[in-house]
Amino acid sequence: MSTFILGATGLVGSQIVKVAESSPAIKSITTLTRRTPDFANSSSKLKTLEESDSSKWSEIIKSQAVSSDVYLSAFGTTRAKAGSAENFKKIDYGINYSSAKAAKENGSKVCVLVSSMGANASSPFLYMKTKGELEDDIIKLGFDHTVILRPGALLGERKESHGLGNSIAQTIGNWTKGTWLQGLLKPIDASDVGKVAIDFAQKGINGELKDKVIIVGGDDLVKLANSLN
């Protein structure tokens, strides 16, 4: 099985790479990042592509003839990091969608998208609305299987700040994990999201998924992660 991973230097994406590297079922891994990742040359089955201008990523996927069985994306940003609502949508929706479309056109059969708890195209909130619109439009691309993961507060060490809101959510998530309060934020370790993402990827290629579209919310994501640990 071959995989293509977008957002591989992020909190969840880097964990997806780690799990993929350790999986004997995965024979090749391709990543596309803005900068040289820490894991470059960490595995003989890993190929890293670099382009600082992410608006060119979809064309790189096409021109490099990157054809993988599974397309996984944990790519994303925040309004604070993007600088404006317009830039946020251009990055979080635009780059994600164009890259997924290119992967589909290149023959990827399964798509695993790491989205967010509360994603809804009808939401009045920019972040949730954009995530929901992205989900809807990626589903319309028509992969054999589209798996959408909606984690709650992500736990783990980030290399880059994603803004005060994310920092607060992560701190509270750490405090509430294992308590009755965890039902509010549904905290989950990024490494566990990585495990679930790769598990779904393998099941999709192996013909073990019955549904064409699978959306996994925070509670179910935690349960699935626990079953894999």
From Swiss-Prot:
GO terms for cellular component: cytoplasm; mitochondrial outer membrane. It is a peripheral membrane protein. This is Protein FMP52, mitochondrial. Keywords: Membrane, Mitochondrion, Mitochondrion outer membrane, Transit peptide. It is found in: Mitochondrion outer membrane. Residues 1-36 form a transit peptide. Belongs to the FMP52 family. The lineage of its organism: Eukaryota, Fungi, Dikarya, Ascomycota, Saccharomycotina. It comes from Candida albicans (strain SC5314 / ATCC MYA-2876). It comes from the Eukaryota. GO terms for biological process: import into nucleus. The gene is FMP52. Pfam families: HIM1.
